[in-house]
Regions:
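Short, surface-exposed, charged loop/turn segments at secondary-structure junctions
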Residues: 115, 121-124
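Short, flexible beta-strand-to-coil junctions
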Residues: 6-9, 97-101, 107-116, 259-261
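C-terminal, surface-exposed recognition/capping segments
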Residues: 4, 111-113, 133-261
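GGW-centered surface loops in extracellular recognition modules
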Residues: 21-107
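Short acidic-hydrophobic catalytic motif
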Residues: 92-93, 98-109, 121, 128, ...
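A short, surface-exposed interaction/processing loop segment used at functional sites
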Residues: 119, 129-136
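Viral virion structural and adsorption modules
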Residues: 1-31
Length: 261
């Protein structure tokens, strides 16, 4: 039995299993489409060897009558790790994208709040720390978000290309979505003003999928000042902004990305 993978471009990846006879003659072939997007459950976050509950209300403030329960930074970034989930209360959920030759798992929420970019970078979680999870090697990092805003407005998103606009926004504001089966925002999710406390926006499908309202996610890029770093989300699905790399505001969050190695 031979396995065969063919990338047709535009997100179309085919897998085939080919049966061979004794003399190497192909006797049968099954072909199936491998989707370029999946929503998957994988692993849990640990601190100092203790498995942490998944934040079930991953926002800052109160929505739907419930106050957010994202845990604050525990104090030592080097003590965070990923491992097997032993219960539904701890398992993490990821948006998995197969994009050309790259496979990314992007967490569907911030896992830790009140954390600075410097905290994350000090333990190599900004640009990539290698780890093994469920027998697979990944590089754990954060998304790129664009080195500046687009068109002079923070509400217009980040300069393209960047990963937040490609995967979270799914390119919906610049044309056809990049990934047909991934969540797609509606224009009401990215207005030209802040609505970080809006109950209606919180309840819409795109925020329920990505949990961006009221909590920003640190990204890789450095802002124009040199001491600032890019954040995305919080004020809208498309919002781009900067904070000091040392700031640990309660609405600064860590949204990990696992890149398959």
């Amino acid at each position: 039995m031979l396995q065969f993978v063919r990338n047709e471009g535009s997100g179309r990846v085919y897998e085939a299993e080919i049966d061979q006879g004794e003399l190497g003659v192909v006797t049968g072939m099954q072909v199936k489409l491998r989707p370029d997007y999946q929503y998957v459950a994988l692993g849990a976050l640990y601190y100092d060897g203790v498995e942490l509950p998944r934040p079930t209300r991953p926002w800052n403030g109160t929505f739907g009558g419930q106050t957010g329960n994202s845990p604050a930074f525990h104090g030592d970034m080097s003590k965070y790790s990923f491992g097997p989930a032993t219960s539904e209360d701890t398992v993490l959920y990821w948006h998995k994208f197969i994009d050309q030759n790259k496979t990314l798992l992007i967490c569907d929420r911030n896992l830790i709040r009140s954390i600075s970019w410097d905290h994350l970078n000090g333990a190599n979680f900004i640009f990539g720390k290698e780890l093994e999870l469920d027998g697979t090697l990944y590089k754990c990092r954060v998304l790129t978000g664009g080195s500046a805003n687009r068109g002079g407005s923070n509400y217009a998103g980040g300069q393209l290309p960047n990963e937040w606009d490609r995967y979270v926004m799914n390119g919906a504001d610049v044309g056809e979505p990049h990934f047909a089966y991934a969540p797609i925002p509606v224009p009401e999710d990215y207005p030209g003003t802040s609505f970080k406390d809006d109950q209606i926006a919180w309840a819409r499908a795109h925020n329920q999928a990505w949990n961006w309202i009221s909590m920003s996610s640190w990204c890789q890029e450095t802002g124009a000042s040199g001491s600032s770093r890019v954040i995305r989300g919080r004020d809208s699905a498309r919002y781009w902004g900067v904070n000091s790399s040392s700031s640990s505001y309660e609405n600064n969050g860590w949204r990990p990305v696992l890149e398959l190695l």
